């Protein structure tokens, strides 16, 4: 903490202004860490063994402190000279940057329930040299001799051929606090809640919608402010005085959800989750009949881009190996570009497994136009994840025959 005090002085003559002391000021530099954690599960450890010394399996990227990170696990060790009998584990900086200072923790999870995890940590202990500094993308911190392989394979850390590694990153950040002598707290905006009350009370409503015989009241100004469609409906010369509107292309429950969004800028609470299990159970026609998908279609119909994104984000949570082909077909049908992009990326990263699913066979028959988009996504993924090349040579054959290939992909990357 640094403090500055200034003093002005003058003559002690009775005719001069007395000495004045300005109020002291202060500032405070606070250095702390922004922490985040990621769990990396390696399912099929026995299949990952034998990939070779210096070759690793990588986790998905995760974000902490504004930087991207990933975990590298070397089942056969990182270097042949001194640690080929060990499993090596490293945390890797995946962002382009100049310099990052951070603390790290790597934990091998005890899966027996005894809580005897193997922990290597910078946190809560004195560091002679301070936090670790990573200076460029690809810089890493970790242990070449993280665990002796022979001991690991007979330990409680390996269960059902599965390893779980927890990683915590603490990015060091510094802030300067200069408190003001006077301040007034301004609460968060209540605009959204006030508009929501308009919908709940219907006070001042000036338009009534008839949706399949069910009546809904609303406010023209609110709807016009939120949607170009309704702005044109209410404020062109032909329809300005029309206070009774028939909606023939939506069901009442969908229109009610649409109004909820228009007033409250969120999805209603009764929108059912579409989990991976839900997609497995439902046929495409049944998926189309869910409220969230009908709301997605309404967003496209009424050109509500934010509602479309909310629906896409909601559906995205159900992406899995078994469901991604159905979600790809859905995104193509309803012009959900963000959902399609995420689905294509997921498929590219898990290609071999997705090609074996029944849903992918249906996708080939129902949406043949997606084949070329999927090929581009897979080729792009291989370009970024492999330095050796040649991976995409048989991709088109795999996509065409539904995945009849002897290759197996465990999401390995070769350094």
Curated annotation (Swiss-Prot):
Pfam families: BACK_BPM_SPOP (PF24570), BTB (PF00651), MATH_2 (PF22486)
Keywords (A to Z) from UniProt: Cytoplasm, Nucleus, Ubl conjugation pathway
MATH domain sequence ranges: 35-169
Single GO BP term: response to osmotic stress
Disulfide bonds: none
Domain named BTB: residues: 205-271
Record keyword Nucleus present: yes
InterPro entries for this protein: BACK_BPM_SPOP, BPM1-6, BPM_C, BTB/POZ_dom, MATH/TRAF_dom, SKP1/BTB/POZ_sf, TRAF-like
Coiled-coil ranges (or none): none
Functional pathway: Protein modification; protein ubiquitination
Family, per entry: Belongs to the Tdpoz family.
Assembly notes: Heterodimer with BPM1. Interacts with RAP2-4. Interacts with CUL3A. Binds to MYB56 at the promoter of FLOWERING LOCUS T (FT).
Name of this protein: BTB/POZ and MATH domain-containing protein 6
Taxonomic source organism: Arabidopsis thaliana (Mouse-ear cress)
């Amino acid at each position: 903490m640094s403090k500055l005090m200034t003093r002005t002085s003058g003559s002690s003559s009775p005719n001069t202004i007395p000495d004045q002391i300005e109020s002291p000021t202060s500032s405070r530099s606070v250095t702390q860490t922004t922490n985040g954690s990621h769990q990396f599960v390696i399912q099929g450890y026995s299949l990952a063994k034998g990939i070779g010394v210096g070759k690793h399996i990588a986790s998905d990227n995760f974000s902490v402190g504004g930087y991207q990170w990933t975990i590298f696990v070397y089942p056969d060790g990182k270097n042949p000279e001194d640690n080929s009998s060990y499993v090596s584990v490293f945390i890797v900086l995946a962002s382009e940057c100049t310099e990052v200072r951070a603390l790290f923790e790597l934990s091998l999870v005890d899966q027996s329930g005894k809580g005897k995890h193997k922990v290597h940590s910078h946190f809560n202990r004195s560091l002679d040299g301070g936090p670790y500094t990573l200076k460029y993308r690809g810089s890493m911190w970790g242990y070449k001799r993280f665990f002796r392989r022979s001991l690991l394979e007979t330990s409680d850390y390996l269960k059902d051929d599965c390893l779980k590694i927890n990683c915590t990153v603490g990015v060091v950040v510094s802030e300067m606090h200069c408190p003001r002598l006077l301040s007034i707290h301004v609460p968060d905006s209540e605009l959204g809640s006030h508009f929501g009350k308009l919908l709940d009370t219907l006070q001042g409503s000036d338009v009534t919608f008839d949706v399949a015989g069910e009546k809904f009241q609303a406010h023209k100004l609110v709807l016009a402010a939120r949607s170009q469609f309704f702005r044109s409906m209410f404020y062109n010369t032909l329809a300005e005085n029309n206070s009774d509107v028939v909606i023939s292309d939506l069901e009442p429950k969908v229109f009610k959800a649409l109004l909820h969004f228009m007033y409250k800028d969120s999805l209603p609470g009764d929108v059912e989750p579409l989990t991976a299990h839900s997609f497995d159970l439902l046929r495409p026609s049944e998926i189309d009949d869910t409220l969230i998908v009908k709301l997605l279609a309404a967003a496209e119909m009424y050109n509500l881009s934010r509602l479309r994104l909310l629906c896409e984000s909601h559906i995205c949570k159900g992406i899995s190996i078994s469901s991604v082909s159905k979600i790809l077909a859905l995104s193509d049908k309803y012009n959900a570009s963000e959902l399609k992009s995420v689905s294509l990326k997921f498929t590219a990263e898990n290609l071999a497994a997705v090609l074996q699913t029944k849903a992918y066979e249906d996708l080939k028959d129902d949406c043949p136009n997606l084949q070329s988009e999927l090929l581009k996504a897979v080729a792009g993924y291989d370009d970024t994840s492999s330095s050796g090349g040649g991976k995409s040579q048989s991709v088109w054959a795999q996509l065409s025959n539904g995945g009849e290939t002897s290759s197996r992909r465990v999401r390995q990357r070769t350094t």
